[in-house]
């Protein structure tokens, strides 16, 4: 009897390898690509890029500025006819996002040819929290399959995205990985399920290493006292992004999609352009 993808994934999983945002429903409304990203001529088709993820991708309101998720910047890299429906929510894992019923509205809205970008890991690592924690090669992969299966059953195309790295350096100033076995477990699942994977973990680790401890301060949410009214005492956050950081991580995602010819050749724009921070905006609420 032929071995199914699910059986193959289960066998692979057995190998010993290595925060809620207010106004989430409003934030998940599709955001069209900006006019500056529109190319000439008639688009091949219109579609939506859905995002399921955590705070590193999630939309923020004005009260959280200048913090920004990479999903807020993704529309600038999409061509005419493509929109972003950012359902990512602060503090969620692959498990809690699903168990809270947040995957269901995505699957109700998604259409054939749309993309579902799935990026979890930061909160799956919190294994002391039964509502969020998962094991890399068992429950993490099991929950991720629910996103893959749901999208594929509706003719949409799921894409796994490894979790973006935090800002952590060793004594020699080299960027260090922080996600344990979760990125490798996602890579293994993508191979077993034959779905595209954008390796943002590897791309971001290399970029943070290139920028170094000083350069990454412009990526992450490090603010001096008095720099922003929402954080009068300043802030030092090595997980979440300033607008520039959100743009650069969105660029990593967009480049990975283009390499995989998703959603189709020519759908991605401005991948090598200087993009101003002003493309990121925060709705009131």
Regions found by a protein language model. Give the residues of each.
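N-terminal secretory signal peptides and thylakoid transit peptides that target proteins
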Residues: 1-15
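Glycine/Thr-rich phosphate-binding loops of Rossmann-like dinucleotide-binding domains
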Residues: 59, 94-95, 126, 169
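Alpha-helical cap/lid subdomain in secreted, periplasmic
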Residues: 102-247, 251-266, 283
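Structural motif
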Residues: 93-101
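Serine-esterase "nucleophile elbow" of acetyl-processing enzymes
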Residues: 34-88, 104-112, 116
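C-terminal region of N-terminal signal peptides and the immediate post-cleavage residues
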Residues: 19-38
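Short, low-complexity, Pro/Ser/Thr/Gly-rich segments in the mature regions of secreted, periplasmic
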Residues: 277-284
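Short, flexible loop/turn segments with low-complexity composition
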Residues: 262-276
């Amino acid at each position: 009897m032929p071995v199914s993808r699910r059986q193959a994934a289960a066998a692979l999983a057995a190998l010993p390898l290595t925060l809620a945002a207010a106004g989430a429903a409003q934030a998940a409304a599709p955001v069209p690509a900006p006019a500056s990203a529109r190319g000439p001529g008639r688009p091949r088709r219109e579609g939506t890029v859905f995002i399921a993820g955590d705070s590193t991708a999630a939309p923020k309101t004005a009260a959280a500025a200048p913090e920004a998720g990479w999903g807020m910047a993704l529309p600038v890299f999409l061509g005419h006819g493509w929109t972003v429906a950012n359902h990512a929510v602060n503090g969620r894992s692959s498990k809690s996002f699903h168990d809270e019923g947040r995957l269901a509205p995505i699957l109700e809205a998604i259409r054939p040819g749309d993309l579902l970008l799935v990026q979890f890991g930061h909160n799956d690592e919190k294994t002391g929290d039964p509502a969020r924690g998962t094991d890399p090669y068992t429950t993490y992969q099991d929950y991720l399959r629910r996103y893959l299966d749901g999208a594929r059953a509706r003719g949409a195309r799921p894409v796994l995205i490894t979790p973006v790295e935090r800002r952590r350096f060793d004594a020699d100033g080299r960027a260090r990985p922080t996600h344990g076995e979760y990125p490798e477990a996602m890579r293994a699942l993508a191979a077993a399920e034959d779905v595209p994977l954008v390796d943002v973990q590897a791309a971001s680790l290399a970029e943070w290493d290139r920028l170094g401890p000083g350069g990454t301060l412009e990526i992450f949410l490090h603010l001096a006292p008095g720099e922003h009214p929402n954080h009068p005492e300043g802030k030092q956050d090595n997980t979440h992004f300033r607008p520039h950081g959100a743009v650069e991580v969105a660029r990593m995602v967009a480049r990975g999609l283009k390499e995989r010819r998703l959603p189709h050749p020519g759908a991605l724009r401005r991948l090598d352009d200087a993009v101003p921070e002003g493309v990121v905006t925060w709705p009131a609420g």
